[in-house]
Curated annotation (Swiss-Prot):
Transcription regulation is among the record's keywords: no
Residue intervals on the Mitochondrial matrix side: 177-444
Membrane topology qualifier: Single-pass membrane protein
The organism of origin for this protein: Xenopus tropicalis (Western clawed frog)
UniProt-recorded name of the protein: LETM1 domain-containing protein LETM2, mitochondrial
Region of interest called Disordered, as start-end residue ranges on this chain: 73-94
TM helices/strands, residue ranges: 156-176
Pfam family of the protein (one): LETM1_RBD
Length: 444
């Protein structure tokens, strides 16, 4: 009984006093849930007999204090709310610079693949020449490939000097660095091709602005001959094309071509206009005026022959790359257009050049209307025809009979403020209204 009373008193003191005053190991009879059993030690012999079944334990906490003193404590303030920080911009991935050995290996692979492709093109070109010697006709695609291969082979002629002259091959990397255009087309990468096309497009846009101003100025000169209305319509149409990016139609170009029948010829163009046309067709604008005219004339002849081949084979057989190349050769936009838009502008060119017989110089200047900084509008699908509901003829006859018997006096009252053309119309309408009112009164 005394042992039980001692354990109860110690338990009550422990829950109300600090853990520093009374420790658990003073009496093994007191047990707590927060104790951890330590099986490494044997039970002490000095303990009482009733506690023989209890193994010694160590407290899992250093202190055991009552929570009563914490009840009156003020609540902790909430953490200050910070505004959400804006998301950090994504950093561009850092380009790891290749070592010297890797760059040398990449250049060796690049030249190996270039010579390999050139050898394949040479074999294919030899077969095409054999077919030509036997009287066969090449397609447009085969003809262009043969011409490209021949141009690549002629580009290798200057490099023979580096092979013939002793120790001059060490200057070959310097020569290629200074004149990269001397290499054949098989050595050109896709990134360099895209960069070159974008630069040419930027130059064409500048030339297109100048040519648009030239066309407007020529139209003002012919204002007295053609009339102010036609010139004003043309000026407004040019402004519309510049502002909205709308593609000019074939009918509009043919209609406005009458304003420039006499002036838009290669003989009447000035040097600035000749230079702009050469840059539009990707020709070197170097030389005298006669040389520039000769270059343009020869280019227009080759374009006409190419147009005849395209019209014979069909625009649908051309790939996207061929459509873009053909558009660039004719001074038209090639980037930023879908395949359908490329085909549409190529068909329009063929119609104007072959069917409408528009002068080549005017045709080139009309391409300046296509080269705008705005993105061209997509081709809109044809609107579906609205079906007209069928009307019963009996209902139509009944409505017409009601209209004949109706009184027209309210209609005439609403027209008091309008100016009538002549007094005879008023008299006739008044007579008809009287007759109609009499008929309605008689019940006819």
């Amino acid at each position: 009984m005394a042992t039980y009373t001692c354990s109860v008193v110690l338990a009550s003191l422990r829950c109300r006093s600090s853990h520093l005053v009374l420790r658990k190991n003073l009496c093994p009879i007191y047990t707590s849930v927060s104790c951890a059993q330590n099986r490494a030690y044997a039970p002490r012999s000095s303990c009482l007999v009733q506690a023989a079944f209890v193994s010694p334990s160590w407290s899992s906490r250093a202190f055991h204090t009552s929570g009563f003193c914490l009840q009156d404590a003020p609540p902790s303030p909430p953490p200050p709310s910070t505004p959400p920080s804006p998301p950090e911009p994504e950093k561009a991935p850092q380009v790891v610079r290749k070592s010297l050995g890797q760059r040398v290996v990449d250049e060796i692979k690049h030249f190996y693949h270039g010579f390999r492709l050139l050898g394949i093109d040479t074999k294919v070109a030899a077969r095409m020449v054999w077919r030509l010697l036997h009287g066969q006709v090449l397609t447009r695609r085969e003809r262009r490939r043969l011409m490209r291969t021949c141009a690549d082979l002629f580009r290798l002629v200057p490099f023979m000097v580096f092979v013939i002259v002793p120790f001059m091959e060490f200057l070959l990397p310097v020569f290629l660095k200074l004149f990269p255009e001397m290499l054949p087309s098989t050595f050109e990468t896709e990134s360099k091709k895209e960069e070159k096309v974008k630069k040419k497009l930027a130059a064409k846009l500048e030339m297109a602005k100048f040519l648009q101003e030239t066309i407007s100025e020529m139209a003002r000169r012919n204002k007295a001959e053609t009339g102010a209305d036609t010139q004003q319509q043309f000026s407004s149409y040019v402004q519309q094309v510049r502002g909205t990016g709308e593609q000019p139609s074939t009918k509009e170009i043919v209609r406005f071509s009458k304003l420039f029948e006499d002036e838009l010829t290669l003989e009447h163009l000035e040097r600035s206009q000749l230079v702009a046309l050469c840059r539009l067709l990707e020709l070197p604008p170097i030389g005298t005026n006669n040389l520039l005219r000769f270059q343009l004339m020869m280019q227009l002849r080759s374009i006409r022959a190419d147009d005849e081949m395209i019209s014979k084979e069909g625009v649908e057989n051309l790939t996207v790359a061929e459509l873009q190349a053909a558009s660039r050769a004719r001074g038209m936009r090639s980037l930023g257009l879908t395949e359908e838009q490329l085909k549409e502008q190529m068909k329009q060119w063929l119609d104007l050049h072959l069917k409408e017989n528009v002068p080549p110089s005017l045709l080139l200047l009309s391409r300046a209307l296509y080269l705008t900084e705005l993105k061209p509008k997509p081709i809109l699908p044809l609107k579906q025809a609205v079906e007209i509901p069928k009307i019963n003829p009996a209902v139509v006859e009944a409505v017409e009979a009601k209209d004949n018997l109706a009184d027209t006096a309210p209609t005439l009252k609403g027209l008091k403020g309008e100016e009538l053309v002549s007094g005879t119309l008023l008299k006739e309408s008044a007579v008809q209204s009287k007759e109609n009112t009499k008929a309605s009164a008689n019940g006819v």
